């Protein structure tokens, strides 16, 4: 990333995760990801309502879900069926958890709360291929608001978002270690109502106008809670 040494760098350059697998490598599932372990392969499973998980996994619980932690502090995700999930974290290292779609580019509705004490994002998060792009649409954040190379603004769903582009060099991704672009839409003011809509096409079109071309939507898209060296909680329900 271009902003070496900044807090933005640090949240994306987290300590080595469990079993030596990166967060991006773990989350690349598109519904078929397997987590390599010393004893074999942990395949995505089907969870049940009110199931609390603390180990890295993907699966379905009414909707696709993904949970990854680097093992720092105490982090859990509770799967409540349908599009609902909650998280609790205390003195975490880095984690990301969310529900959504194994492949996706559709509109998203959500409600609930995101309550970080320190650094974290409440965001729509996903990847495209060819070109490989990691993208964020950030509606809420904790002590740090992400930035990058400024590309303009887009108005959508009752708010104005600043558009940023950053680059990751030789970094872990859903396609292995590669250099790739990150695209960001970051709301100028946080969503405080507890509910929101993200019309993804508005952001994708604005990125294209700024010369930020997307690829194919072969990979997952989740409404995510991410924390970095912080504590907090969230309770989110996602729908299309």
From Swiss-Prot:
This is Endo-1,4-beta-xylanase C. InterPro entries: ConA-like_dom_sf, GH11/12, GH11_AS_1, GH11_AS_2, GH11_dom, Glyco_hydro_11, TAT_signal, TAT_signal_bac_arc. It comes from Streptomyces lividans. Its EC number is 3.2.1.8. Pfam families: Glyco_hydro_11 (PF00457). The active site is at 134 (nucleophile), 226 (proton donor). It is an enzyme of class 3 (hydrolase). The keyword DNA repair does not apply. Pathway: Glycan degradation; xylan degradation. Changing residue 23 to K: 4-fold reduction of XlnC production and severe impairment of precursor processing. 7-fold reduction of XlnC production and severe impairment of precursor processing. Residues 1-21 are annotated as: Disordered. Residues 51-239 form the GH11 domain. Belongs to the glycosyl hydrolase 11 (cellulase G) family. It catalyses: Endohydrolysis of (1->4)-beta-D-xylosidic linkages in xylans. The keyword rRNA-binding does not apply. Keywords: Carbohydrate metabolism, Glycosidase, Hydrolase, Polysaccharide degradation, Secreted, Signal, Xylan degradation.
């Amino acid at each position: 990333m271009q902003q070496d040494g900044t807090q933005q760098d640090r949240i994306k350059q987290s300590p080595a995760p469990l079993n030596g697998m990166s967060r991006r490598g773990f989350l690349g599932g598109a519904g078929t990801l397997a987590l390599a372990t010393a004893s074999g392969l942990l395949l995505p499973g089907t969870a049940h309502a009110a199931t609390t998980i603390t180990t890295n996994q993907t699966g379905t619980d009414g909707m696709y879900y993904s949970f990854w932690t680097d093992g720092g502090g105490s982090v859990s995700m509770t799967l409540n069926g349908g599009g609902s999930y909650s998280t609790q974290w205390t003195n975490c290292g880095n984690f990301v958890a969310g529900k959504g779609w194994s492949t996706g580019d559709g509109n998203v509705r959500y409600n609930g709360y995101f309550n970080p004490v320190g650094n974290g994002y409440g965001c729509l998060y996903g990847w495209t291929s060819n070109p490989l792009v990691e993208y964020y649409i950030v509606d809420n954040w904790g002590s740090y608001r992400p930035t990058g190379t400024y590309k303009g603004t887009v108005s959508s769903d009752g708010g104005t978002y600043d558009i940023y582009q950053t680059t990751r060099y030789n970094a872990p991704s859903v396609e292995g270690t590669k250099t790739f672009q990150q695209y960001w839409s970051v709301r100028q003011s946080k969503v405080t109502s507890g509910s929101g809509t993200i019309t993804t096409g508005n952001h994708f079109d604005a990125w294209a106008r700024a010369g930020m071309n997307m690829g194919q939507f072969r990979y997952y898209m989740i409404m995510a809670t991410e924390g970095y060296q912080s504590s907090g909680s969230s309770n989110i329900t996602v729908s299309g």
